[in-house]
Amino acid sequence: MDVEEKKILKMSVRNLVEFVLRSGDLDNRRTSGAEKTAMQEGSRIHRKIQRRMGADYKAEVVLKHIVEEDQFKILIEGRADGVIDKPEGLTIDEIKGIYMDLDYLTEPIPVHLAQAMCYGYFYCYDHHLNGAVIQLTYCNIETEEIRRFQVEKPFEELELWFQGLVHEYIKWARYLYNHGIRRDESIWDLEFPYPYRAGQKDLAVAVFRSMKRKRNLFIQAPTGIGKTLSTLYPSIKAMGEGLGDKLFYLTAKTITRSVAEESFDILREKGLYFNTVTITAKEKLCFLDTPECNPDACPYAKGHFDRVGDAVYEIIHKEAGITREVILTYAREFQVCPFELCLDISNWVDGVICDYNYVFDPNIRLKRYFSEGISGEYLFLVDEAHNLVSRGREMYSAIVYKEDFLLIKKLLKSVDGKIVKLLDRCNKELLRMKRECENYRLLEDIRFLITSIMSLVGELERFLEVNRDFADRDLILLFYFTLRNLVYTYERLDENYRIYTENQSDGRFMLRLFCVNPANNLKECLNKGNSTVFFSATLLPVSYYKELLSGDLDEYAVYAPSPFDQKKRLLIVASDVSSRYTRRNQREYEKIASYLIKIVSKRKGNYMVFLPSYHYLKEVESILSVNRTAKETFTYLSQNTHMNEQEREAFLMEFSEHREDSFVALCVMGGVFSEGIDLKEGRLIGAVIVGTGLPMVCTEQVILKGYFDEKGQKGFDYAYQYPGMNKVMQAAGRVIRTDRDEGIIALLDERFLKLDYQALFPREWDGFYEVKLNTVENVLEDFWKNRRKGE
């Protein structure tokens, strides 16, 4: 094979050294190390040190090296923090900002030294130099104290060491090469597994085109069009064309992860050779009742890194769809941590199915793909993308409570005077803020508090490192991570954040760094890949989601038509009821109950009723419980607060197609049953939606409204109406899941008759009937009579 035609496999320096050099136990009691480095590379400390180093110091130098093999090449690349190339010799500088007291750091952390040695070898190789001084610069985040370690390495030693490093990686590279050839051959022959539904092919073409142009795409596609396969298939085809080398399928809920797994299986049955792993939360994978990732508490942590390579190598050669159950089987066989095994497998598969937070959350995201300076040929599919707005705000915000400082002080009062003193300093500043806060208060700056918290973080890190068996270590560790996240978030503050304090209803005093517009933070992650497709059945208005998910109103957008016969669905809007707070009274609750009785009485079947709150639900339930007509017409069951998985499954089991009586489920709008519930083929024939779904007026919503008003936009729409309407459309989407289904959607609130609400209706809602309590039965009777004729 000609050298020019060789396939290039890419690997980052960081991932290479972390993968090859790890050994021994898994131990999360250590708070220092490569994975705990404060702020990651490229932080404020890096820039500050780099600016101090003078004219000879070149910062952020991109270095690459190609390793030639018979059939392929390995491109290993990274970014050196600093290069000092003087006539008297070369120095490679690797900077790490850490919280721990530098007195406890007696030698460089091995993986950091290995990274710097790689850069030293690359630079010497490219510039024909005889060797380099490898320098590790550690800087305490709070004090800015610096400790440097230097070791001189001749080129021959660097070369021999690097060859040994690469030798350990070659068998894995061969796997990637051979697997990639077989995968791409299968993709070229792959056809769409079913006849295309109306609009489905256009959707697939739009996805492929956007990926070919390395653009992002927003898709509004109603239920039933087959969004998962319509986005997966063209994405896989794009990978076969070399437009990406790893596909991330991102979801907000477990149920949609299952749909993605099933869709990949369908394509494999059609000949696709493509392996995937589903990343599951640590708590759901751990063999222990409570995860304790250290060799003293968990036998799977002891010697984990000595065995995990063999486990990964076997699983990627034997399995294609690597689910939670598969992970657990191999983890038991090889005696390794199932969660860490799962993360390692992600390096070697074609597709990763995971929750949003593994890509976006700065505390949880997969650093092997998304750390500073690391990018790749990634393709992102963001399922149920409407959820990413609120999830994004949550992931990029930070909260601390004053009371937690007092709790930790109580735990450490007789143990560590230095920490107690810092806790007092922080508490004093929070107390000052509390005195100035009536209900809530917006703040401009909290620099003094952050400085104190940074000192506290450093001391807590020292304490945790030394006191690994402290009785309340878990509480202190959680507090440490909370503070670290606050500092991390503080360093990201820009015009898209608001800082505020609030006296909570439970008596606690809260400080929050609130990310009101997450677009910039989300884009920072997505820009590490080639293309992103956001899709949902409720992505309206699309301009709202463009602004808050990517920040670019010029992104591509597609509106897919509904594939279903509109005659099988009736949409009614009630003009004589409303869930406005001023209208929440006994008379209104009774009217809602009367609507339910009239709606259900016209056709036996299963119905879901979505109410504005638990309180509202209980009011309606109390009326139904004593209404004789209701008792004769249907059986009902109410959603409870904090239902576990088994209770939810039991609730959904009530929706049988062959019930002898009608069944009504009373649910809360925006709750667990509002989306991701697939009750098809006669299991649900009606969704009754009470109210417009507006979020409750609270501090967060008030701040959101103020932020968008300040930007000259419609603050009420952004903070209340759009999120509310999304909940309405999600609830309505529970009805009619297949072309065999039929049913009704009842919008019980007069506000839906206003033009600003109707402007937000999806296209398939064209044509609705306005009803009152005394006319609704006639409209329903006509609809069901026509449906019987249609049968």
Report the location of each language-model feature.
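Walker A/P-loop
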Residues: 212-234
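A contiguous, basic/glycine-rich beta-loop/short-helix subdomain that forms a polymer-engagement track
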Residues: 327-352, 363-370, 462-578, 587-588, ...
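A substrate-engagement module of RecA-like helicase motors
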Residues: 184, 191, 243-352, 360, ...
